[in-house]
Curated annotation (Swiss-Prot):
InterPro entries, sorted: DM15 (IPR006607), La_dom_prot (IPR045180), La_HTH (IPR006630), WH-like_DNA-bd_sf (IPR036388), WH_DNA-bd_sf (IPR036390)
Modified residues annotated as Phosphothreonine in this record: 223, 376, 526, 649, 724, 769-770, 782, 785, 788, 797, 845, 865
Protein name per the record: La-related protein 1
Organism lineage: Eukaryota, Metazoa, Chordata, Craniata, Vertebrata
Coiled coil location: none
Keyword vocabulary terms for this entry: Acetylation, Cytoplasm, Isopeptide bond, Methylation, Phosphoprotein, Protein biosynthesis, Repressor, RNA-binding, Translation regulation, Ubl conjugation
Gene3D superfamilies documented for this protein: Winged helix-like DNA-binding domain superfamily/Winged helix DNA-binding domain
Subunit details: Interacts with PABPC1/PABP. Interacts with EIF4A1. Interacts with RPTOR. Recruited to the active mTORC1 complex via interaction with RPTOR. Inhibition of mTORC1 activity strongly reduces interaction with RPTOR and the mTORC1 complex. Identified in a complex with mRNA, PABPC1, EIF4E and EIF4G1. Found in a complex with PABPC1 and SHFL.
Organism: Homo sapiens
Biased composition (Basic residues): 242-252, 337-355
Feature: compositional bias, Gly residues: 97-110
Transmembrane segments: none
Amino acid sequence: MATQVEPLLPGGATLLQAEEHGGLVRKKPPPAPEGKGEPGPNDVRGGEPDGSARRPRPPCAKPHKEGTGQQERESPRPLQLPGAEGPAISDGEEGGGEPGAGGGAAGAAGAGRRDFVEAPPPKVNPWTKNALPPVLTTVNGQSPPEHSAPAKVVRAAVPKQRKGSKVGDFGDAINWPTPGEIAHKSVQPQSHKPQPTRKLPPKKDMKEQEKGEGSDSKESPKTKSDESGEEKNGDEDCQRGGQKKKGNKHKWVPLQIDMKPEVPREKLASRPTRPPEPRHIPANRGEIKGSESATYVPVAPPTPAWQPEIKPEPAWHDQDETSSVKSDGAGGARASFRGRGRGRGRGRGRGRGGTRTHFDYQFGYRKFDGVEGPRTPKYMNNITYYFDNVSSTELYSVDQELLKDYIKRQIEYYFSVDNLERDFFLRRKMDADGFLPITLIASFHRVQALTTDISLIFAALKDSKVVEIVDEKVRRREEPEKWPLPPIVDYSQTDFSQLLNCPEFVPRQHYQKETESAPGSPRAVTPVPTKTEEVSNLKTLPKGLSASLPDLDSENWIEVKKRPRPSPARPKKSEESRFSHLTSLPQQLPSQQLMSKDQDEQEELDFLFDEEMEQMDGRKNTFTAWSDEESDYEIDDRDVNKILIVTQTPHYMRRHPGGDRTGNHTSRAKMSAELAKVINDGLFYYEQDLWAEKFEPEYSQIKQEVENFKKVNMISREQFDTLTPEPPVDPNQEVPPGPPRFQQVPTDALANKLFGAPEPSTIARSLPTTVPESPNYRNTRTPRTPRTPQLKDSSQTSRFYPVVKEGRTLDAKMPRKRKTRHSSNPPLESHVGWVMDSREHRPRTASISSSPSEGTPTVGSYGCTPQSLPKFQHPSHELLKENGFTQHVYHKYRRRCLNERKRLGIGQSQEMNTLFRFWSFFLRDHFNKKMYEEFKQLALEDAKEGYRYGLECLFRYYSYGLEKKFRLDIFKDFQEETVKDYEAGQLYGLEKFWAFLKYSKAKNLDIDPKLQEYLGKFRRLEDFRVDPPMGEEGNHKRHSVVAGGGGGEGRKRCPSQSSSRPAAMISQPPTPPTGQPVREDAKWTSQHSNTQTLGK
């Protein structure tokens, strides 16, 4: 029947699916696009709006024009009316009824749509028109079953012929541009993949692609005749699968290329793409494919990865059309070096490059010709060029104004303050007015790198505000005379004109050669006038000096040279005794031996000259001030870590770990001045013992040297003078060089142990200067420590700060100073001392390597737990032990105080008050910036909460510390805090500032005008005392309030804590600063003694 002819479509998909033999289900047919593939004149639709006239035609009779353009074939697409878009399905066709009947049934069922289920009217059959004309005639004779035999033969060869024909199509150079267009068109069918595979628009587009390729092999499967419904359905599945594979392959190629166009291009930079090889200019896939490289010559070469914006998009797709579908994956990277195979899938093709990374260009720069050429200079901008006779402006086109600015800034830097403070070479080249030759500046390498033109340098510096040019010389405009330095004196070149008067210059052996003197009496030699050329040349010599040798040893020559002082390192010896020793040698020695001995003596002097220079450097300290302005009274952070705090353990901590709740504080012993001095000396000796342990290896070395010297034989004084001659005298030196005393050995006891007896012996006096004369590192009574040598007397730096003032009964009627100690609830002050350990105790850090510094282990464990003082040889040890003194490492004691302050609250920690007191005393003699900043911060924080003991300790440090060592920055802080304290209603800071101005030796101080106004109200020290307020009782305890404000707090202080605020602050607020300060704040008790008004 005619209905069984139509099931196979050219696109490999069917519109009619057989449910049973002769029964067809018609699917949704979209409207057919118009264009190149429109049907021919025999088409069923033919542009007629009514499909009823064409009912005799089969449903699949839509003609389709093939790629060659001269043949037509009908597509099995059903006819439908224009604009009809609903699905037309016919279920009831059986056996292929008559044409008219079938069309009527379809029209009734379709509701406006035509379902062509009639038998085929095969007037023009596109399936057999082109390939097999006999089949076409058979179809025209309306005997469709005869088409099955030739169709089977052609269908069997379809897959092989398509594969072969596609390879042949790619090899056709004439039709090459057509696949590129097809690749762009094939993106549209890709979007229809999720839709049902039996829709016609994707299939028609695929037919147009096949038609554009001109493959005649696609027509061969369409020449098949339909056998039966089952056979044609099987044929449909086979061709549909083949068309899907082919269609998917066409869709795959452009999609992959568009998404990953640059991944393989970055890896194609290999040695064949170097600039000197123009035959590899087209570095594209044509090189890798190798077979059609001729077609890629006009294509622009791809740019490297670092120039993606110059990539030609159209040429990119054309290049990749010849590559394999999946060779742009991993295989493209591997076969990029020399591979020329197809590289299908993820293989590496036939290339031998493998995973070749470009060792020639480690950064992946692939090409340096074409557009990359102008970019190459940017990789050499960091190179500094030095020119001989060529200016940089001749090599590079630099703006002249910009170049002048560079030159000006470079030379202005040379004359800047920061550079001149370090550039001693430049300052030594300056003349007295600070000028430097412009040629010297132009000879510097950095200036030469800019220009070698002197005139350009003049032009650049013409408008400079830092330097000025005068007569081809340049100097700094501001204070040019302060920078020149005197040039270094070169002592290597001897001025022989100054040596004419030196005895070493006179050829003594010449005189002795002509003078026959007696061997035993050199002074009695009768001088013989010399008449040689050597003597005649010495016309400038004094008369006596050129006459005879004895005149060389006369005292008159020494007086002329004005060098009567010998080196202090040895006993004084006159020049006469020295030269008499030289002339007392046996006279029978030849003159050559005397000459060689003079040369040996000179070499000996030269050998000792380095040692004398070291001694001379040490001697300079004796000509300068003993105290250094910068380092005096200062201590660095490393020495702070060596401090051991010696303080009393509170009585309540010793007996009651939970705290003393009785209020009976009698643990502090009354400290007299004599007892304090004994303890202070004891701490000195304890410190001496700590350092003696450190220097023990040094003592052993000295003892070994002494033992070695004891093995030396005794010699006479003359022989010793011969072995150790005097150093040469420099005539240009105004101050004679001389070594200072050598470092002294620690103690007398150690000296007795090393040298055997305390009194100096003759052998000790005859030792060289490398052995100390006096076995004392420190003085006998006051040992010196690492910081005390900077002071004139180490005994001035006290080690113990006792509390010597006794508390007295408060008198409510007597005026008093504004001080917490005079309040009704004074703080309990404690004795505190310190020693400097020989090794550093670093604070605990997160680093494992931050262990305590090297050295011998100190006695005891310096943990947070107080440790008793170890035994040392001094009576004060028992005193310290009986009074409960313990030692702590400074940073651990500080941490414990801060923890207690945090735990108990501000102003409630007795240990914190002790730390405040230690800071106030210690910083006066050993200033440390970090310690001072912490002291100030914590004291101000306590004062804000109403606890003023720390602030009072700070003011005491200001007053006494600045009086001992004035520091401008500390003085500014003193003024600032004094103004704040007075404006808060307090008088203690102003009193300490008034005392500093009265007793300090500093003059011409710049004082704040506001502070001067406040000081004008107080003429004497008694003016700072205030009367207690009415109704205040001496034994009445007050609650603390914040300084400067009224209103008390309900917090009650522990009896042992310091009062941050004076008592009786609740009754009335402080008087404003502008008023009379006498009635400001009556919270102070009476002053117990006039002698202690400025006390601590």
